[in-house]
């Protein structure tokens, strides 16, 4: 048995049994404890999302809630929303979509808790806020070793594994256009272009990352959702039957009993968790960068990111595939080729070009969002400019190499590290959940008094944070 085989087995066990229990349990628990905050205060989140960025004493714009939302959505909305959903349908059938939706609805509560905690325990350095699970593990739990372990896992997963995967998916999307693509120089040329473009963005710092994300993500999300709506309108007579099939297959007891690990339940839940990342500890790294008056405001904004990712974008992919009538088979016609063929069946060949363009836009936004997460954690381990620049060079190299080869070992390692990362984060937010609930109570109390909520640490019995009067 090779090391890659061991990683695959560990990955299957972790996602099928351990993470499903922890993340689904966490979603249910926090939904109950917050009284469904992801539904009750959703309109507040939309309002805060649109608040304009303020300027600092030097006249420089601060990171707004919207920019922080776009950075986290950039990371969430990658090729997994296209290729990943196709694979889920091919392997788990239409019923997987229902469980994916349910995970997003429940996961919104976990996303709220972790992002609120990231805001509460963020730090300010060189005029910019940073934070995330590593920071609340150190500042609130007093366990720096736990934060360092989390940071190492996240860096391996996002900076190297997932960014290599995004680059490879962009490269593989060109196979439709260039015969014998893998044996040409085009993968290397694409690798150079992607590496150069990513370098330009990341050396511009958080403001450039936020600006690029806030341009690419909203435009592409709207275009992609519109494409989904057009496809559904062209097949409107079939929609009732498709929705009925999704719900029937979701509760197909015979299929579930026949093989739980490969059932629609497990595949849908795994895809939902993998796509929206709620509770996994990645998005809080972006949440902490926002300059807001109350931590709850950014917690609510991050709920929207989960819904954008799964309820809107993943659902658009699912509907485009299901109405096409094109059959997907794992290993034969799955992932990107499945989507390209399904779209062309609906709207003609131009749909293939649209999917290719979407893959490039979503994947590039993911590259810079993933990098931002990793940078925050490098600085947590050691705040060194030399280390940061060396790290940036290695990230660029991973993207360059990822465009040229299928590094399945690296990606399996990334999946395993993300699993461990999620376990560490879920333990932390369970331990710190009451802090987030006190902060939520403070927000709702001020809101009932007709105030625009402002947060100060002593109001909820905290000390040692940036939230001083």
Regions found by a protein language model. Name each.
Residues 2-3, 33-38, 80-85, 161-171, ...:
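Transmembrane helix-loop junctions in multi-pass membrane proteins
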Residues 26, 30-31, 103-127, 133-134, ...:
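Helix-loop-helix module between adjacent transmembrane segments
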Residues 57-89, 117-120, 125-134, 138, ...:
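Alpha-helical membrane segments and immediately flanking helix-loop junctions
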Residues 112-122, 126, 227-245, 253, ...:
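Extracellular/periplasmic helix-exit of transmembrane alpha-helices
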Residues 36-63, 87-97, 109-141, 327-346, ...:
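Flexible loop linkers connecting adjacent transmembrane helices
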Residues 8-44, 90-128, 308-316, 352, ...:
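Extracellular loop-to-transmembrane helix junctions
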Residues 1-79, 90-96, 107, 400, ...:
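N-terminal alpha-helical transmembrane segments of multi-pass membrane transport
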Residues 22-29, 33-46, 169-174, 186-247, ...:
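Membrane-interface loop-to-helix entry segments
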């Amino acid at each position: 048995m090779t090391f890659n085989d061991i990683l695959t087995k560990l990955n299957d066990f972790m996602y099928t049994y351990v993470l499903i229990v922890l993340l689904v349990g966490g979603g249910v628990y926090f939904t109950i404890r917050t009284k469904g905050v992801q539904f009750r205060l959703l309109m507040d989140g939309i309002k805060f999302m649109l608040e304009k960025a303020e300027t600092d004493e030097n006249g420089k714009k601060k990171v707004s809630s919207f920019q922080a939302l776009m950075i986290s959505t950039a990371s969430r909305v990658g090729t997994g929303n296209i290729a990943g959903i196709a694979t889920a349908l091919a392997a788990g059938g239409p019923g997987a979509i229902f469980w994916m939706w349910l995970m997003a609805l429940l996961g919104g509560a976990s996303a709220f808790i972790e992002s609120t905690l990231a805001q509460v325990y963020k730090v300010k350095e060189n005029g910019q806020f940073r934070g995330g699970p590593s920071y609340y593990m150190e500042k609130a739990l007093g366990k720096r070793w736990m934060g360092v372990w989390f940071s190492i896992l996240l860096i391996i997963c996002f900076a190297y594994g997932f960014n290599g995967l995004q680059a490879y998916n962009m490269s593989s999307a060109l196979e439709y256009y260039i015969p014998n693509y893998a044996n040409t120089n085009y993968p290397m040329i694409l690798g150079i272009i992607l590496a150069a473009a990513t370098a330009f963005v990341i050396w511009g710092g958080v403001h450039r990352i936020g600006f690029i994300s806030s341009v690419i993500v909203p435009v592409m999300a709207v275009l992609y959702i519109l494409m989904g709506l057009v496809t559904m309108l062209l097949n409107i007579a079939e929609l009732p039957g498709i929705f009925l099939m999704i719900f029937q297959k979701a509760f197909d007891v015979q299929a579930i009993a026949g093989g739980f690990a490969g059932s629609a339940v497990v595949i849908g839940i795994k895809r939902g968790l993998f796509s929206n990342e709620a509770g996994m500890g990645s998005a809080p790294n972006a949440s902490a960068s926002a300059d807001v008056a109350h931590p709850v405001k950014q917690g609510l904004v991050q709920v929207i990111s989960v819904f954008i990712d799964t309820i809107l974008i993943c659902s658009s992919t699912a509907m485009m595939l299901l109405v096409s009538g094109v059959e997907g088979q794992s290993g034969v016609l799955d992932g990107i080729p499945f989507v390209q063929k399904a779209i062309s069946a609906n709207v003609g060949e131009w749909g293939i070009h649209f999917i290719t363009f979407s893959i490039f836009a979503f994947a590039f936004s993911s590259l810079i969002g993933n990098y931002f997460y990793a940078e925050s954690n490098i600085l947590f381990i050691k705040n060194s400019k030399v280390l940061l620049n060396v790290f940036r060079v290695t990230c660029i190299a991973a993207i360059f190499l990822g465009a040229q080869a299928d590094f399945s070992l690296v990606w399996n390692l990334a999946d395993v590290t993300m699993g461990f990362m999620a376990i560490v984060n879920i333990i932390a937010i369970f331990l710190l959940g009451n802090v987030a609930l006190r902060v939520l109570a403070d927000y709702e109390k001020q809101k009932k008094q007709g105030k625009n909520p402002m947060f100060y640490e002593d109001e909820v019995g905290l000390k040692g944070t940036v939230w001083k009067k």
